[in-house]
From Swiss-Prot:
Gene name as annotated: Tmco2
Keywords associated with the record: Coiled coil, Membrane, Transmembrane, Transmembrane helix
Coiled-coil regions listed: 127-150
Phylogenetic classification of the source organism: Eukaryota, Metazoa, Chordata, Craniata, Vertebrata
Protein name (Swiss-Prot/TrEMBL): Transmembrane and coiled-coil domain-containing protein 2
GO cellular component: membrane
Length: 183
């Protein structure tokens, strides 16, 4: 009968990882190799005590809104599966954003994590502004080209509009006759 190598150290690592308070600590222990026997103490005060309750409230509200929305869509019509799927995806994204915001708040209660997110939004905004500027420059070039085409098609000689009572041509330099009323 073959003998298997002892794997008590990997079982111990697995049990230690399962005993940790967050998945982040477990990921650090597995991939980076940090092994701390006790979780690091945090001093979050009331936020530390409210974290499980808020996450449960977020989960319950997500499931409640999901049930209400699905019931409303089902009562209305079953033919639109795409609307139901879009509703579920949107609701899940809202839940994830709320949960992520709460996790950032738990990780850094001073609020500097929000500043990092704002910096990312600034870079995103700058990239979007660059794209808009390029599109505007492209439109401006097309307008110039169209103006050139219009000028090229315009007749070189001006028409004599003096014989017509009301001139409707665009290259007439004389003012239009009025009906006696002046403004």
């Amino acid at each position: 009968m073959p003998t298997f190598p002892t794997t008590t150290s990997s079982w111990d690592n697995l049990l230690n990882a399962l005993a940790r308070s967050s998945i982040w600590n477990w990921l650090q222990a597995m991939f980076i190799g940090e092994t701390t026997s006790a979780p690091q103490p945090t001093n979050l005060g009331i936020l530390d005590n409210l974290a499980p309750a808020v996450q449960i409230i977020l989960g319950i509200s997500f499931l409640t809104l999901l049930a209400i929305g699905l019931f409303a869509l089902w009562k209305r019509s079953i033919r639109s599966i795409q609307k139901i799927v879009m509703f579920v995806i949107t609701l899940y994204q809202l839940y994830k954003k709320g949960s992520d915001f709460f996790q950032v708040l738990l990780a850094n209660p001073e609020g500097s994590g929000r500043q990092i997110q704002d910096n990312n939004n600034i870079f995103l905004s700058l990239g979007l502004q660059e794209k808009i500027l390029k599109k505007l420059q492209m439109v401006e070039n097309k307008v110039r080209d169209l103006e050139g085409i219009i000028v090229a098609r315009k007749p070189a000689s001006k028409r004599d509009c003096s014989s017509e009572p009301y001139c409707s041509c665009s290259d007439c330099q004389s003012p239009l006759p009025t009906s006696g009323f002046t403004s």
